[in-house]
Curated annotation (Swiss-Prot):
Temperature-activity profile: Optimum temperature is 120 degrees Celsius. Activities at 100 and 80 degrees Celsius are about 50% and 10% of that at 120 degrees Celsius, respectively. Is unstable so that the protein loses about 45% of its activity after heating for 15 minutes at 100 degrees Celsius. However, the enzyme is not so intensively inactivated in the presence of ATP.
Entry keywords, A to Z: ATP-binding, Kinase, Magnesium, Metal-binding, Nucleotide-binding, Thiamine biosynthesis, Transferase
UniProt xrefs under InterPro entries: PurM-like_C_sf (IPR036676), PurM-like_N (IPR016188), PurM-like_N_sf (IPR036921), ThiL-like (IPR006283)
Residues reported in the UniProt entry to bind Mg(2+) 2: D40, D68
Function as written in the Swiss-Prot or TrEMBL entry: Catalyzes the ATP-dependent phosphorylation of thiamine-monophosphate (TMP) to form thiamine-pyrophosphate (TPP), the active form of vitamin B1.
Binding-site residues for Mg(2+) 3, renumbered to this chain: E25, D68, D194
Other observations noted: Reaction mechanism of ThiL seems to utilize a direct, inline transfer of the gamma-phosphate of ATP to TMP rather than a phosphorylated enzyme intermediate.
Source organism phylogeny: Archaea, Thermoproteota, Thermoprotei, Thermoproteales, Thermoproteaceae
Quaternary assembly: Homodimer.
Binding site for substrate: E243, W286
Residues binding Mg(2+) 1: V39, D40, D113
Result of altering S196A: 90% decrease in activity. However, displays a 30-fold increase in the catalytic efficiency toward ATP due to a large increase in affinity for ATP
Organism in which the protein naturally occurs: Pyrobaculum calidifontis (strain DSM 21063 / JCM 11548 / VA1)
Name the UniProt record assigns to this protein: Thiamine-monophosphate kinase
Length: 293
């Protein structure tokens, strides 16, 4: 670890440093000889929600990896999973969720590993075919499009015990995420990311060498009304959610934006900043070893 200045660095800063050391492009997937490879994982002590079963937790980790592959226009085919658990009963429940997710997403579950430990940890590897190489650096003049369903998970984190239709939509999305959204025309897309650590994280990650100006909040009316009725900051709700597993695509301005997608931001020349309502966006999403920013 020589040369790594770890003080004050979070998960994303560490990974950026590591990829630089390895000479690998910073992205959410790896491209190797026409293949796409993705690894993703989580520990229950930091990532399992109180309303998730162990099977839900297994499913969630498959969905997280699948979302990163799908947003890159790649076709995931094979799945391997490593599970750590304190007992075989818990491990079996997690594996059941992994199996159910593999069937739902049409993945061949071909193997994995099992370990004993105090925490429950799930690591998923997906391998598939890469149709094209899609990075996450948009160009000036592009517009950002997404499916306007942000905010539900934010409300679920805060109000899951309260219930209600709006909150329940977020709870269900967090228990068994299903990132099977349609893809826009590939020839129109210049960059892509999915929102797992919050929309703010996506925007700051894409704003490298360019500025991003948010024009509209990509959230449904019922989410905005729910937040307003309770005096919540709608920016916090929309930008600092997480685990939406919704796609954000940078597309050429001359391409049509068709349902279920909406245009919500513009890419302009700049120095890597994100703007909302004339001010620099203060929300940066989630990162391990830092928390919400």
């Amino acid at each position: 670890m020589s040369g790594f200045g770890g003080r004050g660095v979070d998960e994303k800063g560490f990974l950026r440093w590591l990829l630089g050391e390895l000479g690998v492009e910073e992205d959410d997937v790896a491209y190797v000889d026409g293949l796409v490879v993705k690894v993703d994982g989580a520990a229950a002590s930091t990532s399992r929600l109180p309303f998730q079963t162990w099977a839900d937790f297994g499913w969630r980790n498959v969905a997280a990896a699948y979302s990163d592959v799908r947003v890159k226009f790649a076709e995931a085919r094979l799945l391997l999973a490593s599970v750590t658990a304190p007992d075989l009963g818990t491990a079996a429940e997690v594996v059941q969720g992994v199996r159910e997710a593999s069937q739902f997403f049409s993945l061949a579950y071909v193997g994995g590993d099992l370990n004993e430990g105090r925490d429950v940890v799930v690591d998923v590897v997906l391998v598939g075919w890469a149709r094209a190489r899609v990075g996450r650096a948009p160009r000036p003049g592009d517009v950002l499009v997404t499916i306007p369903q942000f905010g539900y998970t934010s409300l679920a984190y805060r109000f899951w015990q309260m219930g209600g239709a709006v909150v329940e939509r977020g709870v269900e999305a967090l228990k068994r995420p299903k990132p099977l959204w349609p893809l826009p025309p590939a020839e129109c897309v210049t960059a892509a990311m999915d929102s797992s650590d919050g929309l703010g994280d996506v925007l700051w990650s894409m704003a490298r060498g360019v500025d991003i100006v948010v024009k509209e909040l990509p959230a449904p009316r019922e989410v905005l009304e729910f937040a307003a009725e309770r005096g919540l900051d709608v920016g916090e709700i929309v930008f600092n959610g997480g685990e939406e597993f919704l796609p954000v695509f940078a597309v050429r301005r001359d391409c049509p934006v068709e349902s279920p997608y909406v245009s919500f931001a513009e890419v302009v020349p700049g120095e890597g900043r994100v703007w909302w309502r004339g001010e620099e966006l203060k929300w940066r999403g989630w990162a391990y070893f830092r928390g919400w920013g």
